[in-house]
Amino acid sequence: MITESRQMLDKRNRPLRDLRISVTDRCNFRCTYCMPAELFGPDYPFLKKEELLSFEELERLATLFVTRFGVEKIRLTGGEPLMRKDMPELIKKLARIPGIRDIAMTTNGSLLPVYAKRLKEAGLKRVTISLDSLEDERFKKINGRGVSVSKVLEGIEAAKQAGLGVKINMVVQKGVNEKDILPMARYFKEKGHILRFIEFMDVGNTNQWEKKDVMTKAEIIDLINKHMPVEPIAPNYIGEVASRFRYLDGSGEIGVISSVSDAFCGSCNRARLSARGELFTCLFASSGFDLRAPVRQELSDDELSEMIGTVWKNRIDQYSVDRTLSKASGKKKVEMSYIGG
């Protein structure tokens, strides 16, 4: 049933349309900009199994977001989501929710050779795969676990063969991998996959972010345009975070996610559910709203919906805009590996 709450807007008149679900805070990589190995070591207190929302609890909450609030897309994140056991079973549960249009996953790709076919059969439609360099030694250093580029490329091919839609994300950092922009663009242009460049962001508190390390959207596009001319094109939908550009020779497109240099807070329609069941209304949030406790206290769907609706209606987040206006300095934020990228 379509309810009035489908049109619910936050304090800045932004609707709720996308839900990102972090299914685990664990990862088999230790990327320097997300889970640096020196801080996320063997003794790091990751969540215990009983602290995680169960698949049944995730299904229940996701159903409310879709049927009561009009969410159309769900993206599964982590950590590395494929570190969570039996992920195809969760996807099957989510795929049967009435009204859901799209289920996607963000992954480092290393486990896709094992899981891609089963994920597709379960109902997953798309994957976004993180790859920050094609140069093996540089990539091994970035991922902090010595994983070779070939392992991720195998995952990309497995996803393609399984019939999943594929996009590639590259986080660009000056002094780290800006030399890889053109090789990455050429490689995935030839392969026919959309590559999206992500400006290095100050997510969490552990990645030693400094603005001088950010290569901006303008700089990235200027570099590519000199070698492979591109032109801007319209977004696919309202709230799409990547600015889109197509190659003038007709051989595909790229995107740039520019949270730092060109904030898109004004059209952000995403809510984020952590693995522990906290609802966050911004990637750069300091705290979330606990939904796990009321779910386990067996509150009714109406009561849970009232809580979710109250959180969204009171949402005022615009961190990236505030950063631009120098209003966000010193704010303590939740780590990306916990909230989901």
From Swiss-Prot:
Q: In which pathway does it act?
A: Cofactor biosynthesis; molybdopterin biosynthesis
GO BP terms in the entry: Mo-molybdopterin cofactor biosynthetic process
Q: Which CDD domains does the record match to this protein?
A: Radical_SAM (cd01335), Twitch_MoaA (cd21117)
InterPro entries (UniProt xref): Aldolase_TIM, Elp3/MiaA/NifB-like_rSAM, MoaA, MoaA_NifB_PqqE_Fe-S-bd_CS, MoaA_twitch, MoCo_biosynth_MoaA/MoaC, rSAM
Which coenzymes or cofactors are required?
[4Fe-4S] cluster
Against SUPFAM superfamilies, the record matches this protein to: Radical SAM enzymes
Q: Where does [4Fe-4S] cluster 2 bind?
A: 265, 268, 282
The UniProt keywords, alphabetically, are: 4Fe-4S, GTP-binding, Iron, Iron-sulfur, Lyase, Metal-binding, Molybdenum cofactor biosynthesis, Nucleotide-binding, S-adenosyl-L-methionine
State the superkingdom: Bacteria
Q: Iron: present as a keyword of the record?
A: yes
The top EC class, named as a word, is lyase
Looking at the record, the residues that make up the Radical SAM core domain are 11-231
Q: Which GO terms describe its molecular function?
A: 4 iron, 4 sulfur cluster binding; cyclic pyranopterin monophosphate synthase activity; GTP 3',8'-cyclase activity; GTP binding; metal ion binding; S-adenosyl-L-methionine binding
Which Pfam families does the protein's record reference?
Mob_synth_C, Radical_SAM
How, per the record, is the cofactor bound?
Binds 2 [4Fe-4S] clusters. Binds 1 [4Fe-4S] cluster coordinated with 3 cysteines and an exchangeable S-adenosyl-L-methionine and 1 [4Fe-4S] cluster coordinated with 3 cysteines and the GTP-derived substrate.
Listed under catalytic activity are: GTP + AH2 + S-adenosyl-L-methionine = (8S)-3',8-cyclo-7,8-dihydroguanosine 5'-triphosphate + 5'-deoxyadenosine + L-methionine + A + H(+)
- The residues that hold [4Fe-4S] cluster 1 are 27, 31, 34
Identify the residues that bind S-adenosyl-L-methionine: 33, 79, 130, 201
Q: What is its EC number?
A: 4.1.99.22
Is Iron-sulfur given among the entry's keywords? Answer: yes
Protein task: Catalyzes the cyclization of GTP to (8S)-3',8-cyclo-7,8-dihydroguanosine 5'-triphosphate. Required for both nitrate assimilation and respiration.
Q: What does the annotation say about its assembly with partners?
A: Monomer and homodimer.
HAMAP family the record matches: MoaA_B
Q: Which family does the entry's similarity section mention?
A: Belongs to the radical SAM superfamily. MoaA family.
Q: What name is this protein filed under?
A: GTP 3',8-cyclase
> What organism does this protein naturally occur in?
Bacillus subtilis (strain 168)
